[in-house]
């Protein structure tokens, strides 16, 4: 495993070139999961490796929360931003990155994907007033009002709400797919079809447990709709679904994030039902989650001062509200140690993963520069004092990968894949 540490201070951005493959170790004729030719075949390779930068955690107006925040930028807008073009913030100013990214994934919430945008266009029915609120959201106060109305709908005793619309979810998922396909430029700008699985055993209240994952597809062979918390809140069921789809030629990996907000549940030493972890469970987790997102706008999940008392940088970018949650099982360094102990005592290690950083922007555009920091939450980003500050002169600018050609990012993230995105 080759690890690239890409920051001046302490935390790791995206590091992984699993197995750091030499040319001799890569079978050039290895078939892909859906038997399509590799996009990297015609792309020059650098035997000394290259460093690539990208963002695998981007939300657009298809995410229910981003739309509530007033974001009206689409997946296409997100990819335009990634390629260096200007896009508009919800408050009307331009957002633009200094240098184009090399790879990117729009990863909107599968949970009610596109439904809020769809409802905003409705002019009839029992929810007309709510639809009007969505359309007329212009200020931070409007956001708080529409959030309150949304929670009233979500907290209804009925299993069915105005948000349950599979047709809209499927058409929105197709929009995600189409945008990734339009903007994919092998060797120049690689896009991945993706979504966020937004789950937790406790979803509301003062201390919800964040068990969210971004699911990233290797190719354009993808299911007709994403798997969401409406299917199951148990991540183990997500892994089983991924295994099933992988057997059908739809290969993917999941990237957990915000372990710091998981209330100790992301890196437990037991299963979802609190039964004992076994080797089969460890293998399934590793197969589906070879990498975790340990730094983003909602703080670092690397470590905590109470877990690393001898590390003077352990308090860097700690999310204040995370201090109110259970630290044990919520941070990466501790999980790596737990995994080594489990390997020694039990013979298996479910936590031998790599790390990545990403933006988690809900503006369709990651904000990476201190001098022009626009934050992540649409209309809630203004006025400027709402955005707070970032202590680094150049805060975490997505992830970095060592690889030898520009479409092999996937293989650099995936312990068992070394061949990048494949053609459809």
Q: Positions of the model-derived regions?
A:
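Extended, charged catalytic domains and RNA/DNA-binding interfaces, predominantly
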Residues: 25-424
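Sec-dependent signal peptide recognition
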Residues: 6-14
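Long, low-complexity intrinsically disordered regions enriched in Ser/Thr, Asp/Glu, Pro/Gly
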Residues: 10, 22-24
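Short, Lys/Arg-enriched N-terminal segments with co-localized hydrophobic residues
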Residues: 1-5
């Amino acid at each position: 495993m080759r690890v690239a540490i890409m920051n001046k201070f302490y935390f790791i951005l995206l590091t992984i070139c699993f197995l750091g493959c030499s040319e001799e170790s890569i079978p050039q004729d290895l078939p892909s999961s859906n038997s399509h030719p590799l996009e990297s075949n015609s792309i020059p390779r650098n035997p000394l490796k290259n460093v690539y930068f990208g963002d695998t955690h981007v939300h657009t107006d298809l995410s229910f929360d981003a739309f509530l925040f007033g974001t009206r930028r689409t997946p296409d807008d997100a990819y335009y931003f990634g390629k260096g073009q200007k896009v508009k913030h919800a408050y009307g100013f331009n957002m633009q990155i200094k240098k184009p990214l090399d790879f990117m994934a729009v990863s909107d919430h599968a949970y009610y994907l596109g439904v809020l945008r769809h409802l905003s266009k409705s002019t009839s029915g029992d929810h007309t007033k709510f639809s009007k609120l969505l359309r007329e959201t212009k200020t931070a106060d409007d956001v708080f009002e529409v959030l309150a109305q949304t929670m009233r709908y979500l907290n209804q005793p009925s299993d069915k709400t105005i948000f349950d619309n599979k047709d809209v979810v499927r058409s929105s998922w197709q929009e995600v797919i189409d945008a990734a396909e339009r903007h994919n430029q092998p060797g120049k700008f690689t896009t991945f079809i993706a979504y966020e699985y937004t789950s937790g055993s406790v979803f509301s209240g003062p201390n919800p447990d964040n068990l969210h994952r971004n699911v990233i597809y290797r190719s354009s062979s993808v299911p007709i709709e994403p798997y969401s918390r409406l299917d199951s809140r148990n991540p183990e069921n997500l892994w089983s679904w991924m295994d099933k789809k992988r057997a059908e030629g739809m290969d993917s990996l999941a990237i957990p994030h915000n372990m710091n907000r998981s209330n100790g549940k992301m890196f437990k030493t037991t299963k979802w039902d609190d039964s004992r972890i076994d080797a089969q469970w460890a293998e399934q987790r590793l197969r589906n989650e070879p990498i975790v997102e340990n730094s983003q706008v909602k703080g670092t999940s690397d470590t905590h001062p109470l877990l690393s008392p001898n590390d003077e940088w352990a308090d860097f970018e700690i999310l204040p509200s995370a201090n109110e949650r259970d630290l044990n099982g919520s941070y990466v360094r501790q999980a790596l140690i737990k995994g080594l102990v489990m390997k020694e005592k039990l013979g298996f290690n479910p936590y031998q993963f790599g790390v990545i950083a990403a933006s988690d922007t809900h503006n369709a555009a990651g904000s990476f520069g201190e001098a022009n920091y626009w934050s992540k939450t649409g209309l809630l980003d203004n006025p400027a004092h709402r955005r707070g500050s970032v202590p680094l002169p150049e805060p975490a600018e997505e992830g970095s990968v060592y690889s030898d050609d520009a479409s092999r990012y996937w293989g650099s993230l995936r312990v068992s894949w070394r061949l990048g995105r494949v053609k459809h």
